Amino acid sequence: MYQAANDRYEKMAYVRCGKSGLKLPAISLGLWHNFGDTGVYENMKEILFTAFDNGIVHFDLANNYGPAYGSAEKNFGKILKEELGVYRDELLISTKAGFDMWEGPYGNWGSRKYLLSSLDQSLKRMGLDYVDIFYHHRMDPETPLEETMGALASAVQSGKALYVGLSNYDGPTLEKAEAILRDLKCPFVINQNRYSIFDRTIEKNGLKDTAKKLEKGIIAFSPLAQGHLTDRYLKGIPEDSRIMTDGRFLKKSALTEEKLVKIRELNGLAAGRGQTLAEMALSWILKDGIVTSVLVGASKPEQVLDNIKAIQNTEFTEEELRKIDELSLV
């Protein structure tokens, strides 16, 4: 039976989420790719245990994480039931709904019917009475924002979520949503968005500035740009890489020779800081205190340990920041 490390809280920094009472670990663990039915169950357990032993208390899921849809929640729920659940009050568990989950008009987007039905299903798969954070997973251009935000508020009012969050929103829509949730007295605390040295969308669409103004947290996903910001591709594209074996999310065409040159230069900059490229990429996201936590994935426990090293050096010189911008901004 798993027993958590006694010194787990000495290994991680915890950051207040906006102006709320909730704190997140600087590094959080996402269960997007490696906790579905194609994963090895014992490896999933070791990844989660390694994370928790090192102070990572936040585990992020969504209804359709897998593959297959729902399988990441199901496997996570099994691990909770068998071993990790004794620490439930020390864990921050989130899930989401907003992308396609089941057939028909009620299995996608942002209707009240979809969101609340999906949350009930997620709780059942994980064997939980509530989640700590329930997110709407993406903006819905057709459903009234009042309906979607009302569904999030209902999740809290029914005791099925403690806090709510928004994922993949832009600045203007965030501002409108926040006003609705504030009127509903709903504890909206966090935004989840893609952010990395190579992807500055939240700087361009107003999300980062608006979240700061509204005193809401941000948790950044894909901080390593689907592996581009690691040593994985420094010598080209390996045959066993995700680009070659699974092109759904990462296309070979995205890794041009020009991009590889930039990656190698960034790697040299990281080495000068005494970091790996991945460590520097994570540190860069945390550099200004606006992003609360960085969401990392892991296919093996060792990757969790490597990612945690990023919190040891989040200070950058002006010259380092200038060079990073020069190599990454289009």
Identify the function of each model-found stretch.
Residues 18-36, 94-107, 130, 135:
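N-terminal small/glycine-rich loop or linker at the start of catalytic domains
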Residues 123-143:
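Active-site groove signature of glycoside hydrolases
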Residues 35-40, 64-72, 140-144, 171-172, ...:
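Acidic-and-aromatic substrate-binding clefts and catalytic sites of carbohydrate-active enzymes
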